[in-house]
Amino acid sequence: MVSSQPKYDLIREVGRGSYGVVYEAVIRKTSARVAVKKIRCHAPENVELALREFWALSSIKSQHPNVIHLEECILQKDGMVQKMSHGSNSSLYLQLVETSLKGEIAFDPRSAYYLWFVMDFCDGGDMNEYLLSRKPNRKTNTSFMLQLSSALAFLHKNQIIHRDLKPDNILISQSRMDTSDLEPTLKVADFGLSKVCSASGQNPEEPVSVNKCFLSTACGTDFYMAPEVWEGHYTAKADIFALGIIIWAMLERITFIDTETKKELLGSYVKQGTEIVPVGEALLENPKMELLIPVKKKSMNGRMKQLIKEMLAANPQDRPDAFELELRLVQIAFKDSSWET
């Protein structure tokens, strides 16, 4: 159904990325708060990123508390709006798909095309901002590790490889914190680089394992990229590596300064002289390199240290999959009360 009346009122801008602007918004009928990511489809790259995010989030048939939920996607053209669905025969939707496939605008460039992603509103910023504005806290670290491993297992079960896991892409929801004893809820977001692994050609009914779905496009953020991503031949095990970088950095409060934004970011790295080098890049050059874990603290629980080393193994086959990772983190968190000492 096409309408000239949007269902949402945009309240304020809360974030701006390379291909979209995120607003706090309210649903007119209910006054409920939501987040709206508004993406201008003026370039093929924007369209491709937007469709990747739409396809990934719309492919998920159930919700997970630690994965951002897509309420709906709205396509706006010259003031008219319509709800967009995956596989739609709408000419507007098909023009966007054609633009993504051909790498050139397949519609009248004089028309103003926008996609609105309506999602959960997260009121606590991102994981990077949240952690770096507070003192290290063992309970928070435990909660965040368990939430992130649960989210990743859920995504991989749904054949989704995120490909850009980093603290900036993990949002914080504090609205359900009824008491000061509760930790905030994390939500993995920003699926613009994600990949949905399709069923195998031999048996279309059987979903393909994300750990056997090989990808070749080198993408992500360099300090969180696995060595095989730099090479351009990788699977979902690259997400395990990225999460290993995040967990290691969180436990030891390892940070670096982004050269472009000058922001302090959580992320582990390797020092080579006076330079800091992404762990994945260093392991690509020297796969036998022994990572110094812990690098700042005097000691670390043996099982936690071993798990991080396995997550950051140069050979992806030596890393645990998301389901083993989730189980082992639960065991470490609940069977060893002093795991972080």
Curated annotation (Swiss-Prot):
PROSITE patterns to which the protein is assigned, alphabetical: PROTEIN_KINASE_ATP (PS00107), PROTEIN_KINASE_DOM (PS50011), PROTEIN_KINASE_ST (PS00108)
Example GO molecular function: protein serine/threonine kinase activity
Chain ranges of the Protein kinase domain: 8-334
UniProt subcellular location: Nucleus
InterPro entries, alphabetized: CC_SR_Kinase, Kinase-like_dom_sf, Prot_kinase_dom, Protein_kinase_ATP_BS, Ser/Thr_kinase_AS
Domain of life: Eukaryota
Active-site residues, as the UniProt record annotates them: 164
SUPFAM superfamilies according to UniProt: Protein kinase-like (PK-like)
Top-level EC class as recorded in UniProt: transferase
Entry-linked Pfam families: Pkinase (PF00069)
EC number: 2.7.11.1
Keywords of the record: ATP-binding, Kinase, Nucleotide-binding, Nucleus, Serine/threonine-protein kinase, Transferase
Keyword Cytoplasm: no
Recorded catalytic activity of this chain's protein: L-seryl-[protein] + ATP = O-phospho-L-seryl-[protein] + ADP + H(+); L-threonyl-[protein] + ATP = O-phospho-L-threonyl-[protein] + ADP + H(+)
Keyword Nucleus among record annotations: yes
Binding-site positions, ATP: 14-22, 37
GO cellular component: nucleoplasm
Family, per entry: Belongs to the protein kinase superfamily. Ser/Thr protein kinase family.
Name of this protein: Serine/threonine-protein kinase PDIK1L
